[in-house]
Amino acid sequence: MSWTKPAYTDLRIGFEVTMYFASR
């Protein structure tokens, strides 16, 4: 993904946090 957007960054961070908690 080369396009950068604040909303996309928030979504990506939230997704990574969700995956982090889901893999625990």
From Swiss-Prot:
Pyrroloquinoline quinone (Glu-Tyr) cross-link site: E16-Y20
InterPro entries to which the protein is assigned, alphabetical: PQQ_synth_PqqA
Keyword Hydrolase (UniProt): no
The entry's keywords: PQQ biosynthesis
Superkingdom of source: Bacteria
The UniProt record lists the keyword Translocase: no
Primary role: Required for coenzyme pyrroloquinoline quinone (PQQ) biosynthesis. PQQ is probably formed by cross-linking a specific glutamate to a specific tyrosine residue and excising these residues from the peptide.
Family, as annotated: Belongs to the PqqA family.
Record's protein name: Coenzyme PQQ synthesis protein A
Organism, as annotated: Pseudomonas syringae pv. tomato (strain ATCC BAA-871 / DC3000)
Lineage: Bacteria, Pseudomonadati, Pseudomonadota, Gammaproteobacteria, Pseudomonadales
Gene: pqqA
